[in-house]
Amino acid sequence: MLVSSNVTMQFGSKPLFENISVKFGGGNRYGLIGANGSGKSTFMKILGGDLEPTLGNVSLDPNERIGKLRQDQFAFEEFTVLDTVIMGHKELWEVKQERDRIYALPEMSEEDGYKVADLEVKYGEMDGYSAEARAGELLLGVGIPVEQHYGPMSEVAPGWKLRVLLAQALFADPDILLLDEPTNNLDIDTIRWLEQVLNERDSTMIIISHDRHFLNMVCTHMADLDYGELRVYPGNYDEYMTAATQARERLLADNAKKKAQIAELQSFVSRFSANASKSRQATSRARQIDKIKLEEVKASSRQNPFIRFEQDKKLFRNALEVEGLTKGFDNGPLFKNLNLLLEVGEKLAVLGTNGVGKSTLLKTLVGDLQPDSGTVKWSENARIGYYAQDHEYEFENDLTVFEWMSQWKQEGDDEQAVRSILGRLLFSQDDIKKPAKVLSGGEKGRMLFGKLMMQKPNILIMDEPTNHLDMESIESLNMALELYQGTLIFVSHDREFVSSLATRILEITPERVIDFSGNYEDYLRSKGIE
């Protein structure tokens, strides 16, 4: 069991959170949730021993092991991929290292012989003889091919290194497992594999994720970090949302009743306190008022941006016609002879494993990349709004937030229209004076949504738009795209996002491109996957 006792973390004058006392155990899987900036990752670092709290402490049962998903993807460059995974089990790795050292000696002393015999017993008890096989299986699960297993980590591409570190955390199979954003950099199929692996484990887990479907599939409890406090609810994310909403509504309703009661008593006191015959009753009611205590309703750190995408000019019939489209690089074509006819109003989800060509397809459709062959023909009146996955180039100038958004004013827009958009997207009057380039990833994402709101395109193309967003922004974006009347083409690894939006699926595989008319759940059923 992992226990936090009166944990407080303070940066500057205001505490990030305070007096958190909670027990994590029993093989439960806790989803640690809260708005960006509420302190989730900070609290996770404190639980893992990587950060000292301002006050309080964290204790782990002495016979239990703790494991965690590391974020330092360049820390193992000189090790093989397989060894990096095995290093997740610290005790096993240390025994293996000492055992290998003794066997590598030119001559083994009698003392070395006794020592290595003891090490062999420990190695066997920790299933060391199957370590490479188990590590290899996990690497295949996260998408690392066999030919890379014995190579150095330095040859694994950034992003994919994080997959190796996920395999490392899973290999540890500890009593307590801490996972901070384990689905980052994973495609939708690998996330489904991870859900199955975690559900088969007996470890107590604490998981930070913005993937609602993942939290629903894996978590048995939700730990909500809000109001500077931590509250634990039984159930998955959807069940938590219902329970938390009902609890807050009950609190507000109880306070409303108490306020009405106070007002009624106060009215009596005001009318009759000077009346000699009723002064005792007035005094009694005044005492009743003193006894009524309103529950404190703290301001939530959660805020939902207001996102709505409108069309300036509607299209009719076909939005896009693609014929014989082929695009590749030095290693050959990513997709070949792709034909696609997209009708107005369709919402097309482009799926596939990482590196298969999803972003390349979108870049080719918008003209950022030229096809090797084939044609891309948009409707004559198409007005395209594009959200690129890598959009840092849009923020390289020195414009303030207000100046940056003002670039996208349309005919008839004034300064107030820009301020209105920024306000809906949760940027304060102080925020809009900041340089846009210093904004966080989530804030830059909201800025790009504002750009698209001002442009009023009739076709939206979005490449991983939920990256860096908090849960509230994801849900607001999800609703905005559900209400959008135009045509949508998007890439996402968020299962809930894809399931709720897609009316058509385009899956790119190394062998072919699959075009399926229907939603994602229907597509999975067509493949025999539930």
From Swiss-Prot:
It holds the Pfam family ABC_tran. CDD domains: ABCF_EF-3. SUPFAM superfamilies: P-loop containing nucleoside triphosphate hydrolases. ATP 2 binds at G352, T353, N354, G355, V356, G357, K358, S359. It comes from the Bacteria. InterPro entries: AAA+_ATPase, ABC_tran_Xtn, ABC_transporter-like_ATP-bd, ABCF_EF3_subfamily, P-loop_NTPase. ATP 1 binds at G34, A35, N36, G37, S38, G39, K40, S41. GO terms for molecular function: ATP binding; ATP hydrolysis activity. Disruption phenotype: No visible growth or ribosome-associated phenotype. The keyword Transmembrane does not apply. Residues 2-252, 320-526 form the ABC transporter domain. Keywords: ATP-binding, Nucleotide-binding, Repeat. PANTHER family: ATP-BINDING PROTEIN YBIT-RELATED, ATP-BINDING TRANSPORT PROTEIN-RELATED. Belongs to the ABC transporter superfamily. ABCF family. YbiT subfamily. This is Probable ATP-binding protein YbiT. The gene is ybiT.
